[in-house]
Each structure stands twice: as C-alpha cells, then as structure tokens.
C-alpha cells in the first residue's frame, strides 16, 4: 500500500501547502489586471465616464457606490465559465488557462449581479461536494 505523500516544506518551512497555494493564486489574480482581454471587455461595456453596461441586468452601473462613509467598487469583470469548475479544483494548468482567457469568456457585471452569480456557483460546488 502506497504511503500518503508528505507535503513539501515551502518558503523555508514557514508556509503550509495551503498558504503556498493561496499565495500563488493571489499573485495570478494580480497578474490578470494587466491581461489585455479584461481591459478590452471593460472598454466595450463603458457607456460614459464612470458608467458601464451590466451584462446581468438592464442597469447602467456606476464604477463605484458610496456605502456609509466608504466608496466601494461596483463593477467586476467576470468569467462567464467559472475558473474553478463545479467539480472543484482540477489543477494549476486548468486554473491558469481559465484565468487568462479570451474576451468571449468575460463579461462586466455590477456588484449585485456578480454576488448573485458567485453565490450560485458556490452553492453548486457545495451540492456537488455533498453528493460525492
């Protein structure tokens, strides 16, 4: 019977495997800000200064909204096909390929629509995990 592999020490044994994966994912998310198809998607959805057309609802969404004393981001560029599928984590190659996709897999959503879509996807993953 094969032994369970022992996790490799990361960052001089200061990080667990989960911390390492979280770090890499965050660095990849940062890199997507410079990905041209994301900028192109935003440009095409722009109606006028500070307003974008939400793909999920008929509203013209402002770039930011004021909540109390804070300004919050109100626009997100969303992947139409989720980065992490319903079945869960597949691997780094799939993750990177999905994250750095072309414009036809991207849409601009207001915060309300993005939160609804994200919650729905998370719910589907949760149901799938319970059934397996």
Name the predicted role of every residue range.
Residues 2-64, 92-104:
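Short, charged surface segments at domain edges that flank catalytic/cofactor-binding sites
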Residues 62, 100-129:
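Short Cys/His-centered divalent metal-binding micro-motifs
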Residues 50, 73-76, 106:
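Residues that flank catalytic or metal-binding motifs in active/ligand-binding sites
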Residues 1, 130-132:
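Short intrinsically disordered terminal tails
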Residues 49, 82, 117-120, 131:
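Intrinsic structural disorder/low-complexity segments
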Residues 61-74, 117:
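Cys/His-rich microdomains that often coordinate metals
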Residues 73-91:
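Histidine-centered catalytic micro-motifs used for acid/base chemistry in nuclease
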